[in-house]
Amino acid sequence: MSKAFLPTILEQKEKEVAQLVMEDLQPLRQTYRLYDFLKSNQNKLQIISEVKKASPSMGDINLDVDIVAQAKTYEENGAAMISVLTDEVFFKGDISYLKEISTQVAIPTLAKDFIIDEKQIVRSRNAGATVILLIVAALPEARLKELYDFATSLGLEVLVETHNLPELEVAHRIGAEIIGVNNRNLMTFETDINTSLELSTHFKDKPVYISESAIFTGQDAALVAPYFNGILVGTALMTADNVAKKVKELQIDKG
């Protein structure tokens, strides 16, 4: 893959979307609203735990994982939501993983993919997702707003992902309630946890904020805990010898 990761991924997504048909809408899976949960549980740093077999930056992470057992361990140890990679080409995920996990857990599930079209949103909802990901860097603002409004009209919540101040301002402008700050640059795939710390000075009162990527230890989590409602963690949990212990380590008590 070229150095410019995001354009390469989006080119592939356009090919995939061209092959998708718009599915008939199935009933929305019932669970709590992530936004409400994060707003009312601010005494500790909440964990969005990710099921991820591989990534462009890490290569294969854990190909043999029992995805349902992994997800249940997350839930049993207090995860606020489970993020499921559904991208096949770059992350070795699958929409079927989302379906399997969503039938076995009661907490919200996030469809983690590069979404550029309504067909992907309906497919994710039908597979059991209650939250979808929209990436500011992947979409023009007007299209981002269209997809955001489409998803929320279907009863879904949306995690709007940002990486810099102009993107954060876009998320605020479109009225995003759940905003992610990705510590990973999607062009280079390099990470820097200071991205979260720097952008936190521009946060507003209404949204909830999630720090994503580059969080491996309790020490990392403690750095962002004063400023964020939650963290999204994948690799650290997928490679942990003791998953339950790792989840607990990252759940920083905020009093």
From Swiss-Prot:
Pathway: Amino-acid biosynthesis; L-tryptophan biosynthesis; L-tryptophan from chorismate: step 4/5. It catalyses: 1-(2-carboxyphenylamino)-1-deoxy-D-ribulose 5-phosphate + H(+) = (1S,2R)-1-C-(indol-3-yl)glycerol 3-phosphate + CO2 + H2O. It comes from Streptococcus thermophilus (strain CNRZ 1066). Keywords: Amino-acid biosynthesis, Aromatic amino acid biosynthesis, Decarboxylase, Lyase, Tryptophan biosynthesis. NCBIfam families: PRK00278.1-3, PRK00278.2-4. Its EC number is 4.1.1.48. This is Indole-3-glycerol phosphate synthase. PROSITE patterns: IGPS (PS00614). Transmembrane segments: none annotated. Belongs to the TrpC family. CDD domains: IGPS. SUPFAM superfamilies: Ribulose-phoshate binding barrel. One of its GO terms (molecular function) is phosphoribosylanthranilate isomerase activity. One of its GO terms (biological process) is L-tryptophan biosynthetic process. InterPro entries: Aldolase_TIM, Indole-3-glycerol_P_synth, Indole-3-glycerol_P_synth_dom, Indole-3-GlycerolPSynthase_CS, RibuloseP-bd_barrel. It comes from the Bacteria.
